[in-house]
Each structure stands twice: as structure tokens, then as C-alpha cells.
A protein has these predicted regions:
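C-terminal substrate/ligand-recognition segments
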Residues: 119-121, 126, 389-507
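C-terminal motif of bacterial Sec signal peptides marking the signal peptidase cleavage site
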Residues: 22-24
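An aromatic- and glycine-enriched ligand-binding surface/loop that stacks and positions planar moieties
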Residues: 26-106, 186, 243-427, 558-574, ...
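Bacterial N-terminal signal peptides that target proteins for export
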Residues: 2-14
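Conserved, well-structured interaction surfaces
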Residues: 46-51, 58-64, 91-183, 197-232, ...
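Short coil/turn linking the two alpha-helices of tandem helical-hairpin repeats
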Residues: 178-182, 187, 227, 259-268, ...
Length: 616
């Protein structure tokens, strides 16, 4: 009989592996005795086994919807309003315990939901009940149960067996990777644990990552490049875009290895705070394999065309965002369409928000360069401090609302007082308590027309965990530190040579931005600086990529990434800003201990040998 995965028992029984161990006498399916089904009925056919696997897709947390005013940006991108219960505020203050518990009793973190908040197993269609921490452990156990029962899959073709096994291996590696990125090396759980005494060792980051890499590499060999081109995928033809594929597995294999190769993780594992060259080469190979599938048309993933760029993050027609660029997104539940959880984050009260908006920090906005491809502080960039929003990188205009941008398209003359973004000092969009604190608003993830006048219908926001642009950047980084120069490439197929420089330029070209200037192509350090800036521009506010980047590069403590600033200014007669002053609003508290999140103390003390993360 299948064993129960009960999240309450899972969290308590887990000693420090936190939530891994389950009470073995629980039944997996909470059925009445007369409704009991056998293992063979669950695992015997492709259709029934795939139903078992489907739940793991629902363990992928939508990081934008932990609450109706979710704070997932915990690095240097944004400033929240001045209320003290925001997760962003606590992380700025160095209070990383806030991921796990809050003084207000209201857990705002997508990383954790306590056992009392999770209905049943927390994988049902209730996005506010999902937490990355418990559901990752749950997903790992579920994958192990599936792998332990593969021998029961008898009514299936070899293709169907491969697809089932590939998904199970992928999710086991993926969920371990999700946990590692925040909490470091962990035990790698590759079997179904019982109720016996727990003595699994905590591994180094490298050791954990290499075990995840084995699973992800095996998954890549088994999964299809495109489900629509398989017999198994015909039953869901045209609705397979969010399923994991060969490309997804290669992309996460590369990410897993690149993270393990990065300075922070390499130092934790070996004491050496530089890149691990061999792991970078392995990462480059995995990313290359992912990109090659798209290059040859075997996989459907492509960079979204520029005129549809916003559809990577939100749509206005009720369709799920992301296609064809996103490789990994959470599930979207259609009962959410009528509940607009994003207005409060993106718009001030005057446009229909509830006073809980986030605003991009001016210090972060300075990452956006000029239309000629140069950083704003580079010689010859053409940046004019007296006219700071003219001639910028096209991605600036897709991502940022600045003073004077038209927000309301319709309405009447009575709406003219708020038709344009009044973000100057004293403007009706500028308010520390209910509007912009910085002089900017975030446009990237939400349409300007999603206001209380235009009120565009059917707007869906769903930024994913990984998209193809990220793969290009990570490939460039892996090649740079695996093979030595921006002009280096992974030695793959002779018909597809891709240098590190090429990979970055492909993403820039999508936005009509010229290639990286020659002055940044002469050394690893110069090109790395452009990779850092490019990732800040292209991947802003996506899946805590920035938080992970700053930490893994070990630049988290540098003052330029700790100071969050606002731009104070008046609006001049010509509509241009005057009397501009950059003001430090927050200096983020970052010490050595802030390279990792603390582990739940109540669970660490149950298993002292496991150990808390340093400094916590």
C-alpha cells in the first residue's frame, strides 16, 4: 500500500533534514478502507503513474503569490513601503529569520508555510498555502517513492517508462537544487526513508550538487525534447509547454554545476573563493546542449520576440505567460484570474493599489545602460545627467516607469490629474507610505493599463524560474571561467560555435542593443562586469536570481550593492527633472552569515550533528 506523505509529520519528523522523514505507518492516499487502492493500480499504467507525477509540478511554488502583497525581491532591486512587516524590509535589516517566522504571525515568505497553514499537503490549487521549503522536501520524497515503484509500471511503452523515470529524476535533482541555493549543502535523499534513526550526513555544497547533477543528467537522457512530438504526449497535445523536457533538465544541470563552481559555493566546499574551472566546463557543456536543441529546432524554446517581450511575464488575453522562452514556471490556477494580486505591488493608491507597492531603487536602475550598449558611466555613453531617461537601453522602457510616463490610456478629463506618472517630489504618485519611495515604478511584470481607470481584463502575471535568456548568460559565465576568455566557446558541434561574447550579444540583440563594447572584451574581469550588469537588467525581479547571484559571486557585502537609493527631483518647466539629488534610503545589513539563510532552529536542535549555518 502507498504510504502517506503528511506535511505535518514531515516537518516534525525531519530532524534536520527538515521535513524529510515521514511516519511510516501513515497511508499515502487518505482514503476510507473501502476506497483503498493498490500500488499496482497507482503505478501500473502510464496514465495512473503520470497522475502520481503530476503532483510534483504543483510543488513548484509561485514565488509572486505567497500573499496578495508578496515580497520575493530580497536583494538590492526594490524598496518596499515603510511598513515594518514587509519581508523585504526585514531582509534589508539583516533579519533573515523572517523567511521562516514573522513577528506579526503572518508569514509573507514564499519560502515557507507552516504546517498549520498548509491544507492537506499544500499542493492543491491554493497558491498562498505553498512554501518552497516544505514542498521541496515533499517533492523529493514523492520522487523517491515513484522511483522505488518503477518496476510496477508494466502497462507502458518504453517511451512512456523513460518519460516517467526522467520526470522523477529531474524533480529529485531540481528540488535539492532549490534548497541548496538558499541553505547550502544538505543530505542528498535518494531513497524512501523510514522511521529508523536518522544519521544521514550533511554534505558540502559541491557533494550535494554533484549528486543532483547525476539525477539531472540522467533525466536529460530520458526526457523528450518536445512532448508534442511523442506518442505519450498526444493525449495532451498543445498543452505540454509547462512540462519538463530534455532542455529543462540540461538547463538545470548547467545551473546546478555553475552554482557549485561559483566563488561562494567553491569556498564552502574547498576553501578556494574562485571559480572551479572543471565544473565550469561541465556547466558549459550542459548549457550548450540545451541551446543546441533550440538552435536545431528539436526544442520549441526560443527568445520571445521583442514586440511581445512582455508576454514572457504577463499577458492581456488570459493565456499563460512564458511561451516560448520559459523553461520552468509554476502552475497557474485559473481561479486566480478574477483576483488581481499584482495591482497592490505595482501601483500606488491613486491608481488602485492598496498602499503596499514596491518601487525600483535608483541605485539599481543605474544598471540600465544606453541604447548604444554602453553603461551610463562609460566614456562615450551619451548619458546626460540632466536628462537621465532619454536614450536608454530599450529594456529600461519595458521595465521601469519614470516621471511623466502615461499610465492611463482611457478615462475622461476628470482622470487627467493622475493620467501621467507624477513621480517628482510632492507628486501624487510619490508617497513613502502608499506610493513610490524612489521616483520609479516597476513596469516589467505588470501592464501600466492595469489601473483603476483602464482596468484591462484577463491580465495574468507569471514570471518563471528560468528562461532561455538566463541560459545564454549562464553559458557565457561558464565558458568565461571554464575556457578563459570572452572569445572562448564550448567545443561542441562544428556547425554551432557559440562564444561567451556571442551568448550575451544574442540576448542584447533581441532588444536591438549593440554587442558588448570592445573595451569589455579584453579580460575575464571586464567581461564579468558586463555579465553582472546584463543579468541585473534582463533578469530583474525574477525568482530571486539577483539574491543568489550577489551571494554566489561573493559581492553581497560590497557597499554598491548594499545601499538602496531614491532620486529626489522637481519637475522643470520643460517636463524634465531638475534639482536632482540621489538619497540613500536604506543600507542593507550584510555580514558573512548572510551568505546563507538560517536553518529552522527547532529542527536543528533535534539533530545537533547536522549543525546550523555559520553565524546563526
Amino acid at each position: 500500500m502507498i504510504k502517506n506523505i503528511n506535511i505535518s509529520n514531515l516537518i516534525r519528523a525531519c530532524v534536520v533534514i527538515m521535513v524529510l522523514m515521514m511516519v511510516s505507518c501513515e497511508k499515502y492516499l487518505d482514503k476510507a478502507p473501502e476506497a483503498t487502492i493498490t500500488d499496482q493500480e497507482v503505478f501500473g499504467t502510464f496514465k495512473s503513474f503520470q497522475g502520481f507525477v503530476e503532483e510534483m509540478y504543483h510543488c513548484i511554488v509561485d514565488y509572486t503569490r505567497s500573499t496578495y502583497v508578496d515580497d520575493w525581491n530580497i536583494a538590492d532591486e526594490i524598496l518596499a513601503t515603510t511598513v515594518d512587516w514587509r519581508m523585504n524590509v526585514h531582509f534589508d535589516d539583516g533579519d533573515y529569520w523572517y523567511w521562516y517566522t514573522t513577528a506579526t504571525g503572518w508569514n509573507q515568505s514564499y519560502l515557507y508555510k507552516d504546517e498549520g497553514a498548509i491544507t492537506e499537503i499544500g499542493t492543491q490549487q491554493e497558491w498562498t498555502m505553498k512554501g518552497l521549503w516544505p514542498l521541496s522536501w515533499y517533492g523529493i520524497r514523492k520522487a523517491n517513492i515513484g522511483l522505488a515503484n518503477l518496476d510496477k509500471l508494466v502497462e507502458a511503452t518504453q517511451e512512456e517508462k523513460d518519460i516517467i523515470e526522467g520526470q522523477l529524476l529531474f524533480f529529485r535533482g531540481f528540488f535539492h537544487h532549490q534548497l541548496m541555493t538558499f541553505w547550502g549543502g544538505l543530505p542528498y535523499i535518494n531513497e524512501v526513508l523510514g522511521s529508523e534513526k536518522l544519521d544521514l550526513p550533511r554534505l558540502s555544497y559541491r557533494e550535494t550538487a554533484l549528486l543532483a547533477a547525476e539525477d539531472l543528467e540522467a533525466a536529460a537522457a530520458l526526457l523528450p525534447a518536445d512532448w508534442d512530438n511523442t506518442a505519450a504526449g498526444q493525449a495532451t497535445l498543445g498543452n505540454n509547454e509547462q512540462r519538463v523536457t530534455k532542455s529543462t533538465a540540461y538547463a538545470y544541470l548547467g545551473k546546478d554545476l555553475l552554482y557549485a563552481a561559483s566563488p561562494l559555493m567553491n569556498k564552502e566546499s574547498t576553501g578556494n573563493a574562485s571559480y572551479d574551472e572543471e565544473l565550469c566546463k561541465r556547466a558549459a557543456e550542459a548549457f550548450y546542449n540545451c541551446l543546441y536543441l533550440s538552435h536545431t529546432g528539436q526544442a520549441f524554446y526560443q527568445l520571445t520576440e521583442w514586440d511581445r517581450y512582455h508576454e514572457t511575464f504577463y499577458t492581456l488575453n488570459g493565456e499563460i505567460p512564458g511561451y516560448p522562452e520559459s523553461l520552468m514556471t509554476p502552475r497557474y490556477y485559473y481561479n486566480e484570474i478574477g483576483y488581481d494580486v499584482t495591482t497592490s505591488l505595482h501601483h500606488p493608491r491613486i491608481l488602485g493599489g492598496d498602499g503596499n507597492m514596491i518601487s525600483p531603487a535608483h541605485s539599481y536602475v543605474k544598471n540600465f545602460g544606453m541604447a548604444n550598449g554602453l553603461p551610463i558611466d562609460a566614456d562615450g555613453s551619451g548619458y546626460d545627467p540632466a536628462d537621465p531617461w532619454t536614450g536608454r537601453d530599450p529594456r529600461f522602457y519595458e521595465s521601469i516607469v519614470y516621471d511623466g510616463v502615461q499610465m492611463i490610456q482611457g478615462g475622461t478629463d476628470a482622470d487627467d490629474f493622475k493620467r501621467y506618472a507624477n513621480l517628482y517630489n510632492g507628486g501624487n504618485y510619490r508617497d513613502d507610505l502608499g506610493g513610490s519611495r524612489t521616483g520609479y515604478m516597476l513596469k516589467k511584470l505588470y501592464p501600466n493599463e492595469g489601473n483603476n481607470v483602464d482596468a484591462v481584463p484577463n491580465k495574468l502575471m507569471l514570471p518563471g524560474y528560468m528562461r532561455l535568456a538566463d541560459v545564454y548568460y549562464m553559458y557565457a559565465e561558464a565558458v568565461l571561467y571554464g575556457y578563459g576568455t570572452p572569445q572562448s566557446s564550448y567545443p561542441g558541434n562544428a556547425g554551432y560555435v557559440l562564444t561567451a561574447e556571442d551568448a550575451v550579444n544574442i540576448v542584447r540583440a533581441r532588444a536591438n542593443v549593440p554587442g558588448v563594447d570592445a573595451r569589455y572584451l579584453g579580460s575575464q574581469e571586464a567581461f564579468k562586469d558586463e555579465i553582472i550588469r546584463e543579468r541585473a537588467v534582463e533578469l530583474m525581479c525574477e525568482a530571486n536570481i539577483r539574491f543568489c547571484d550577489l551571494r554566489r559571486w561573493m559581492i553581497h557585502k560590497e557597499m554598491k550593492y548594499r545601499e538602496k537609493t531614491a532620486l529626489d527631483f522637481d519637475r522643470g518647466p520643460a517636463g524634465k527633472p531638475i534639482n536632482m539629488v540621489e538619497r540613500i534610503v536604506v543600507t542593507r545589513v550584510v555580514e558573512d552569515k548572510h551568505y546563507w539563510l538560517p536553518l529552522p532552529q527547532d529542527q536543528v536542535t533535534i539533530y545537533p550533528e547536522f549543525g546550523q549555518n555559520p553565524g546563526w
